[in-house]
Regions:
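A conserved pocket-lining segment of Rossmann-fold NAD(P)-dependent short-chain dehydrogenase/reductase
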Residues: 1-10, 14
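Residue-level signal for the nucleotide or nucleotide-sugar donor/cofactor binding architecture
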Residues: 10-13, 40, 105
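Short, flexible active-site loop motifs that bind/organize anionic cofactors or intermediates
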Residues: 5, 35, 57, 86, ...
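Mid/C-terminal beta-alpha module of Rossmann-like enzyme folds, strongest
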Residues: 18-78, 107-125
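Conserved C-terminal active-site "lid" loop/helix of NAD(P)H-dependent oxidoreductases
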Residues: 71-101
Length: 125
């Protein structure tokens, strides 16, 4: 089941690159940078996985009201309950791209790489 939750996505390797660029760029002094490559719903991640051969990815997007009811029986879902269905304010990484010359990987590329690594480790089949 794909729960209705959205979050900012960035590859940890891109975060590391941004840190290095910030240390090397004088214009970054005193600045803060949002590094989310984009915001994704869990159902979007499931679709990316499904489209790339990961057949066990969630197939059903659960409505908010169903997820909230299920939260009464699932501790992790209960913790996520306040965030279900909420659209995040879209944080842009434009500042990091402009000042640092930061070029993040696409979220699709990162998701597929992560899934392949998890598969290679034998954690999914």
């Amino acid at each position: 089941l794909a729960i209705p939750i959205q979050f900012g996505f960035v590859d940890v390797r891109d975060v590391a690159t941004a840190h290095i660029l910030a240390m090397q760029t004088d214009a970054s002094n005193g600045e803060r940078f949002a590094l989310a490559e984009r915001d994704l719903w869990y159902k979007d991640i499931a679709k990316i996985l499904k489209d790339n051969g990961f057949d066990k990815a969630p197939k059903i997007a659960v409505p908010v009201w169903v997820a909230k009811i299920l939260g009464n029986f699932n501790k992790q879902l209960k913790v996520a309950s306040p965030f279900l269905g909420r659209v995040r304010s879209v944080v842009k990484a434009t500042k990091a791209k402009d000042i640092l010359g930061w070029k993040p990987r696409s979220s699709e590329e990162s998701i597929i790489e992560i899934a392949n690594q998890i598969k290679e480790m034998g954690l999914i089949k």
